[in-house]
């Protein structure tokens, strides 16, 4: 098998010989190098809708080539591997009436592949002094029957501790001559015709065991011949079988196709458990064992045959992909880490002007009120530390998405707003971030994306100026609407984390490694409606005699520390759950000079519904609610333990042995267990999973 020894599954086609020479041939086979071609191309007439131009397989035996040529080129190399201790498989599949049974079994006049192979194996066993035993089985409706037993007993497919498949109840009959094998093989066919009352379709197989002497000695290898049931479209109305039985047969065919593709593509997971047939042949298919998949095609092409040829070509292409990338399975984890690191680098890359402009949000509409603009020169908001290293703005993006939801909710509730335009520009010449956010009236049409804010009525404009990138000056300009009286405004200097809260006015100055000064100004207005003249006079007086810059920076730092430490969680009454709420802050720490009346914060976030202790004023409802919360907590801790514990710790759980623990460790590397239903992938049913969890929780009490 030098030409195709690297492939686990070799996919070939066989065109069924036709006795009617006058019938037209619809299949065309292209062999670039004749009989020595490593791949061939099969095409057919254009009368089949939805078909591709051609299909590529490893080889195709045309109708003028005999069964002996298949034996010489394909089967004999497999026989030598069986006597070397490996398993080999010959599987014939295709549509109905495509010649599968005749190819494998043959008849008394024209021998099939199974009989011809047995003749070769008997002669080799006689030379080597080995013994041969035969098992004949049938798989019908996900049940395995022993055809050499007179009562056709059911064969149990069991899996041992080491993962080895055991076929309990499958008899092995010694065979010393070809006539004995023919009597066994064709004898069960005659008895089957007598006992079958209703038309049934099943998969039939012959398993030839090679042992060193007798059945009790060590087994060398096995040769399997499998005659698959014919594929048939379940939508056909003229079928003698019911649609349920056709669906079951097709399901087992699909399961075998998936296993063949996974083996040929060298995938890490092979779905042996999808059907009883693939689970039964697991030991014969896995590892370095070789499989010959023969796709039988009739001379007169049908839609069912076209579909089976399409599946066979898919399996063949999977083998070519595995040969092209032989180390894919080994470096899968490395590829995953490289992709994660590259994704992290993309997240840490600062936004450029073009990238930020794509994030702009514009809410267009007809505005009837006076338009007011807020121009704020700032950089991207930094996270957590006031004088720390510059961090990326990924966290701010999540907060902005939350703000967008709140703003849209406010607009839907009919809150009249002025048009607000927020322009953000970076202070450093190397960074230019410009995003505009526009909010219109409730009557305007809402259109697009992210960072949209909704503020009520009047606004405040901050215009900071810079001197040599190190000095800071700010001037507050207060504007009011003509229709309303002058409104009171409270200033509160501070800064917040982008995921925690928004403060009325926050000015944060940071020096990065390039000695660039970044100022963050976040302005928001709280309307009170009284004592405006006195407050404005006092504010102007404070501005004329402002303290030194260092003292102001120290005060801002202390304010930020106190806010981050003592900020309260948002609590909203059930009758008035709005996204905009004003919280009176608790008294700050001893480092803060701001009173509780001035510490007013507005937090834009969805209110969390807390679970009251008197749900519906019913003790039973209260108990049920707390029980549900306790159950969810227990399930979460159990899944967390499954995803993080080592193999030895997993074995301490009830019902988890060495094999299941190893399987859990293997599966969670690909994808962690998120729900209890995911534990069914290790071979547990939903009832068994619930039983394991009950045992673990029951030991607490």
Swiss-Prot record:
ATP binds at residues 94-101. Coiled coil: none annotated. GO terms for molecular function: ATP binding; microtubule binding; microtubule motor activity. InterPro entries: Kinesin-like_fam, Kinesin_motor_dom, Kinesin_motor_dom_sf, P-loop_NTPase, RuvA_2-like. PROSITE patterns: KINESIN_MOTOR_2. GO terms for cellular component: microtubule. Residues 8-318 form the Kinesin motor domain. It holds the Pfam family HHH_3. Keywords: ATP-binding, Microtubule, Motor protein, Nucleotide-binding. It comes from the Eukaryota. One of its GO terms (biological process) is microtubule-based movement. Belongs to the TRAFAC class myosin-kinesin ATPase superfamily. Kinesin family. KIN-10 subfamily. This is Kinesin-like protein KIN-10C. It comes from Arabidopsis thaliana (Mouse-ear cress). The lineage of its organism: Eukaryota, Viridiplantae, Streptophyta, Embryophyta, Tracheophyta.
């Amino acid at each position: 098998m030098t030409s195709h020894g690297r492939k686990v599954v070799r996919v070939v086609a066989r065109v069924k010989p036709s006795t009617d020479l006058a019938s037209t041939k619809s299949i065309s086979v292209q062999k670039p190098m004749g009989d020595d071609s490593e791949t061939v191309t099969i095409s057919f007439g254009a009368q089949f809708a939805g078909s591709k131009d051609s299909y590529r397989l490893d080889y195709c035996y045309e109708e003028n080539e005999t069964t002996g040529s298949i034996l010489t080129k394909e089967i004999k190399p497999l026989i030598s591997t069986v006597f070397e201790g490996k398993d080999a498989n010959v599987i014939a599949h295709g549509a109905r009436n495509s010649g599968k049974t005749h190819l494998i079994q043959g008849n008394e006049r024209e021998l099939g592949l199974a009989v011809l192979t047995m003749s070769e194996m008997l002669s080799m066993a006689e030379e080597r002094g080995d013994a041969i035993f035969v098992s004949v089985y049938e798989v019908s409706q996900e049940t395995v029957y022993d055809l050499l037993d007179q009562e056709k007993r059911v064969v149990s497919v069991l899996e041992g501790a080491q993962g080895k498949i055991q076929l309990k109840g499958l008899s092995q009959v010694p065979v010393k001559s070809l006539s004995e094998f023919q009597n066994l093989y064709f004898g069960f066919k005659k008895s089957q015709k007598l006992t079958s009352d209703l038309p049934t379709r099943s998969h039939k197989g012959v398993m030839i065991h090679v042992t060193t002497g007798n059945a009790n000695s060590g087994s060398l290898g096995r040769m399997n011949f499998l005659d698959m049931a014919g594929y048939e479209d379940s939508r056909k109305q003229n079928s003698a079988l019911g649609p349920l039985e056709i669906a079951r047969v097709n399901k087992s065919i699909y399961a075998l196709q998936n296993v063949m593709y996974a083996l040929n593509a060298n995938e890490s997971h092979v779905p042996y458990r999808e059907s009883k047939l693939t689970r039964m042949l697991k030991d014969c298919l896995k590892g370095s064992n070789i499989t010959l998949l023969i796709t039988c095609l009739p001379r007169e092409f049908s839609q069912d045959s076209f579909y089976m040829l399409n599946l066979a070509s898919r399996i063949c292409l999977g083998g070519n992909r595995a040969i092209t990338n032989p180390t894919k399975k080994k470096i899968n984890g490395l590829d995953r880490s490289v992709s994660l690191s590259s994704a992290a680098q993309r997240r840490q890359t600062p936004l450029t002007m073009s990238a930020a402009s794509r994030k702009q949000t514009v809410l267009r509409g007809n505005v009837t009120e006076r338009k007011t603009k807020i121009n704020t020169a700032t950089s991207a908001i930094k996270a957590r530390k006031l004088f720390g290293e510059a961090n990326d703005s990924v966290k701010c993006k999540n907060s902005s998405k939350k703000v967008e939801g709140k703003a849209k909710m406010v607009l839907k509730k009919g809150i009249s707003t002025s048009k607000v335009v927020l322009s953000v520009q970076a202070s450093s010449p190397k960074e230019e971030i410009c995003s505009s956010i526009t909010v219109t009236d409730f009557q305007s049409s809402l259109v697009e994306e992210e960072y949209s804010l909704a503020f009520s009525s009047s606004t405040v404009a901050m215009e900071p100026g810079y001197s040599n990138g190190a000095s800071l000056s700010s001037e507050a300009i207060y504007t009011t609407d003509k229709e309303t009286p002058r409104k009171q405004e409270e200033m509160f200097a501070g800064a917040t984390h982008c995921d925690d809260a928004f403060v009325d006015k926050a000015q944060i100055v940071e020096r990065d490694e390039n000695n660039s000064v970044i100022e963050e100004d976040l302005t928001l207005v709280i309307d009170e409606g009284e004592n405006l003249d006195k407050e404005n006079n006092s504010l102007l007086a404070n501005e004329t005699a402002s303290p030194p810059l260092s003292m102001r920076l120290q005060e801002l730092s202390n304010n930020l520390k106190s806010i981050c430490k003592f900020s309260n969680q948002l609590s909203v009454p059930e009758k008035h759950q709005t996204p905009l709420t004003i919280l009176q802050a608790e008294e700050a720490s001893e480092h803060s000079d701001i009173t509780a009346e001035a510490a007013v914060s507005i937090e834009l976030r969805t209110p969390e519904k807390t679970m009251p202790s008197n749900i519906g004023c019913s003790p039973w409802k209260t108990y049920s609610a707390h029980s549900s919360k306790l159950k969810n907590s227990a399930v979460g801790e159990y899944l967390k333990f499954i995803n993080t514990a080592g193999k030895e710790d997993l074995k301490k759980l009830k019902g988890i042995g060495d094999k299941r623990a190893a399987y859990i460790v293997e599966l969670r590397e690909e994808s962690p267990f998120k729900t209890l239903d995911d534990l069914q992938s290790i071979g547990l049913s939903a009832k068994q999973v619930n039983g394991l969890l009950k045992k673990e929780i029951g030991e607490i009490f």
